[in-house]
Amino acid sequence: MLLSPIEAQILSQYQLLAVQLNTLSSEVKQLNSTTNQNSRPSGKSSSSEDGVEATNSGSADKLLDNLRNLEMKIGLVYTLFKGAVYSLFLQYEEDQNLKNDEEQRRNDDSDEEPQNHHEIDAIEGENNDDMGDRMESQENHGH
């Protein structure tokens, strides 16, 4: 059975993750052993050395737990940040749409006003023509 390219890529990513986790685990063990060697007091019995080793091991485990908690919190902050940025983009787009709609309304209103003025001018022109015709007819009748 052959793997699709995406399946092969996913498996290689899992393999890389496993290698990194193994490396991290070995580094933590090395850190624990270095810490244990540096903190062992000389002249103590082996029973007290075991207690110090357990304490140092516990400190490293607490450190790892704290790092895991920090990683989860950073992930949550990142998710919230992405949501906030997305919200800002949506709000900006909505504001731009409202501005464009307002400009369109203004343009439509300004396009309608000259038409009304032309209609008024045309009506006034007809009235003026009628008055001019009346004046001419009165002058002609008057003479």
UniProtKB/Swiss-Prot annotation:
Residues 32-62, 96-143 are annotated as: Disordered. GO terms for molecular function: microtubule plus-end binding. It holds the Pfam family DASH_Dad3. Keywords: Cell cycle, Cell division, Centromere, Chromosome, Chromosome partition, Cytoplasm, Cytoskeleton, Kinetochore, Microtubule, Mitosis, Nucleus. The keyword Transferase does not apply. Residues 96-121, 131-143 have a biased composition (Basic and acidic residues). Residues 32-59 have a biased composition (Polar residues). It comes from the Eukaryota. It is found in: Nucleus; Cytoplasm, Cytoskeleton, Spindle; Chromosome, Centromere, Kinetochore. GO terms for biological process: attachment of spindle microtubules to kinetochore; cell division; mitotic sister chromatid biorientation; protein transport along microtubule to mitotic spindle pole body. Component of the DASH complex that connects microtubules with kinetochores and couples microtubule depolymerisation to chromosome movement; it is involved in retrieving kinetochores to the spindle poles before their re-orientation on the spindle in early mitosis and allows microtubule depolymerization to pull chromosomes apart and resist detachment during anaphase. PANTHER family: DASH COMPLEX SUBUNIT DAD3. Component of the DASH complex consisting of ASK1, DAD1, DAD2, DAD3, DAD4, DAM1, DUO1, HSK3, SPC19 and SPC34, with a stoichiometry of one copy of each subunit per complex. Multiple DASH complexes oligomerize to form a ring that encircles spindle microtubules and organizes the rod-like NDC80 complexes of the outer kinetochore. DASH complex oligomerization strengthens microtubule attachments. On cytoplasmic microtubules, DASH complexes appear to form patches instead of rings. Belongs to the DASH complex DAD3 family. This is DASH complex subunit DAD3. The gene is DAD3.
